[in-house]
Amino acid sequence: MSVQYPPQHSVLLVSSGYDHTIRFWEALSGICSRTIQHADSQVNRLCISPDKKFLAAAGNPHVRLYDINTSSQMPLMTFEGHTNNVTAIAFHCDGKWLATSSEDGTVKVWDMRAPSVQRNYDHKSPVNDLLIHPNQGELLSCDQSGRVRAWDLGENSCTHELIPEEDVPMSSITVGSDGSMLIAGNNKGNCYVWRMLNHQGASLLQPVVKFQAHQRYITRCVLSPDVKHLATCSADATVNIWSTEDMSFMLERRLQGHQRWVWDCAFSADSTYLVTASSDHVARLWELSSGETIRQYSGHHKAAVCVALNDYQI
């Protein structure tokens, strides 16, 4: 059966989770246009490549790379080397390599041309999240012991180790697209904010503020592309939207509608919409100006725990 795919410029939402499927949705119509069976494990995280051609799916213990613009069920590439759940994926801006983190306690850097490990960094604790600094020369990661680490790819070493709350798992980190700030959220619902200063090509991290974002676990924190807002997802079934103006972190809006834990979120490119994934099996598209759900994506029959958005404009 031939499947018709939306044109390149349309908005594509991808969701996945514990039902072993990856679902592609036309974001505006809510139509599921493609389903990939991910038979051997749940999917923990999704990431779309900078050129919008590929989708990386983090499972246990593999990472699989899929072609977004075909109907094939088969991955183009499988990255093998982790020994436990893969928790995060980040693509380098030119797409030549990607980085991953895992509950096996490591951060790995992979060559995209041949799926081999180029770098291996040991956290000595399960790693919960990972990202690439906008300067493309540093990795930032956080772990179950409460540590946030910065890794200099040029020096091939850990340059910062931050421990805001000892033995409180740090669940998520996010960095401003302009490299201005780093934010980490933990299992007590607290967010920690650091100002990022450039010193001779390397980042200096200056503590700014701690605030309680939720009463329960933070599952994900994400800065908007324009760095004007922070979204925090939580076990309390809500998403809070915070203003970053003057590092004030005033609560602007609470997004309510999910029935269970909200695990993941992603902003639209213009920072005006947010997509979320929840244990209630549903993904949602929110208009941030009104706080309203404008589209629901129902199709998963177990928890939806990760989303990715491939958009140019909504």
UniProtKB/Swiss-Prot annotation:
**Superkingdom of this entry's organism?**
Eukaryota
GO cellular component entries: cytosol; fungal-type vacuole membrane; nucleus; TORC1 complex; TORC2 complex
Show the Pfam families listed in the entry: WD40
Indicate where this protein resides in the cell: Cytoplasm; Nucleus
Which controlled-vocabulary keywords does the entry list? Answer: Cell cycle, Cytoplasm, Meiosis, Nucleus, Phosphoprotein, Repeat, Sporulation, WD repeat
WD repeats: from-to residues: 1-35, 38-76, 81-120, 122-161, 165-204, 213-252, 257-296
Residue numbers of Phosphoserine PTMs: 141
Q: Which family does it belong to?
A: Belongs to the WD repeat LST8 family.
Which PANTHER family does the protein's record reference?
G BETA-LIKE PROTEIN GBL, TARGET OF RAPAMYCIN COMPLEX SUBUNIT LST8
- The name this protein goes by in its record: Target of rapamycin complex subunit wat1
Classification lineage: Eukaryota, Fungi, Dikarya, Ascomycota, Taphrinomycotina
Q: Which gene encodes it?
A: pop3
